[in-house]
């Protein structure tokens, strides 16, 4: 389930806002220019679906947001817990950085944690299946896919080289807990 927690950047242990309600999440994020939406597939997406099948299932929303925001390229990324480069991939964006274009991701499956640092506040957004998040360019943030990453996401780009992280060199990301998604209870 999606979740937004907001902290003062000086207090990483106690959020002053905590919600799993999609409308409340969208409302709070809108205040800082971030888009949060829920999408639904126009056709079933089976595990192991090809990128083309994934994009076909969400074609109307992909076309809408691409037209609204001027995206030129869309792709599908899939990360599994058994990926031999998972630790390297996780570490790549764990520190505070920004991009020179909007970072827009739609979670087809799985989950990840976007953490935004805006105006002395830290916004921790757990994105799950059916969530779209659009982080404006130059927004300070970090992303954690967890120790056993599992997600399929549609990514949107305006420039082929725009999705380059520009790191701030601050230690703030290390002050906040890393992502550890809740695991469903085991069947007995």
Curated annotation (Swiss-Prot):
Pathway: Amino-acid biosynthesis; L-methionine biosynthesis via salvage pathway; L-methionine from S-methyl-5-thio-alpha-D-ribose 1-phosphate: step 5/6. InterPro entries: ARD, ARD_bac, RmlC-like_jellyroll, RmlC_Cupin_sf. The keyword Cell membrane does not apply. Keywords: Amino-acid biosynthesis, Dioxygenase, Iron, Metal-binding, Methionine biosynthesis, Nickel, Oxidoreductase. Fe(2+) binds at residues 97, 99, 103, 141. GO terms for biological process: L-methionine salvage from methylthioadenosine; L-methionine salvage from S-adenosylmethionine; methionine metabolic process. The record marks 102 as: May play a role in transmitting local conformational changes. The record marks 96 as: May play a role in metal incorporation in vivo. Ni(2+) binds at residues 97, 99, 103, 141. Belongs to the acireductone dioxygenase (ARD) family. Catalyzes 2 different reactions between oxygen and the acireductone 1,2-dihydroxy-3-keto-5-methylthiopentene (DHK-MTPene) depending upon the metal bound in the active site. Fe-containing acireductone dioxygenase (Fe-ARD) produces formate and 2-keto-4-methylthiobutyrate (KMTB), the alpha-ketoacid precursor of methionine in the methionine recycle pathway. Ni-containing acireductone dioxygenase (Ni-ARD) produces methylthiopropionate, carbon monoxide and formate, and does not lie on the methionine recycle pathway. This is Acireductone dioxygenase. It comes from Xanthomonas campestris pv. campestris (strain ATCC 33913 / DSM 3586 / NCPPB 528 / LMG 568 / P 25).
